[in-house]
Amino acid sequence: LETLQQADVVVSEDTRKTGFLLNHFEIKKPQISFREDNEQRVLPKLMEELNSGRNIALVTDAGTPAISDPGFILVRAALAENIPVTAVPGPTALIMAVILSGLPVHSFTFRGFGPRKHGPRKRWLAIDVASPHTLIFYESPHRLIAFLEDALEVYGDRQAAVANDLTKKFETVLRGSLSELLAQFKENPPLGEYSVVIAGAGEKDLDNSDEED
């Protein structure tokens, strides 16, 4: 709250959502929308604000700014011009999802959102097919089933978890094999944004070696 109160401008994807937050805490600040479809047009204006000495608070609609978020473009541009940037720690879906998944958390890879079409998505997933690290993805509700189908085809029937509405009233984490999770979502259509956590390659072999030790 102190950061928002001290900022000269508040930047977010959806100023309506951020407006609810600001109004709730009676913080009156000018807002600028910075989205994937306007970032190249709005970025020069934001850089002008920063170069004039004004402070910008970057807020995300959900999660953490710059992670699977257009705010990354602004952060990179500011750093390129030696403008100081700091971050306010807060919850992020990928960390909560991997912790609650029940899968190994000592080493993991975050992939974020993948391609929308089957062919490119399967090739993108295949990049990590031999990786021993737990894999974390983000996916939208209307592509989740297709994503799980492609993941099952590429990775085989690995253990996985699908998390939704983390930190909210109806927080849900489903755990099981990819085929089991796929069946659940085919029966109960997905709603909301999802974090998908998939076991890395060779987890069973690692478990067996631990038992022998």
Indicate residue ranges for each PLM-predicted region.
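Short active-site oxyanion
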Residues: 4-10, 82-86, 133-135
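Conserved helicase motor
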Residues: 33-40, 114-117
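A contiguous loop/helix-start segment that scaffolds small-molecule binding in enzyme catalytic cores
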Residues: 54, 133-213
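Glycine/small-residue-rich loop that forms an oxyanion/phosphate-binding "nest" at active or ligand-binding sites
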Residues: 43-92
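Class I SAM-dependent methyltransferase SAM-binding "motif I" and its flanking Rossmann-like core
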Residues: 73-131
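Alpha-helix capping/helix-boundary segments
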Residues: 16-18, 63-64, 93, 143, ...
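Glycine-rich, flexible N-terminal cofactor/catalytic loop recognition
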Residues: 1-36
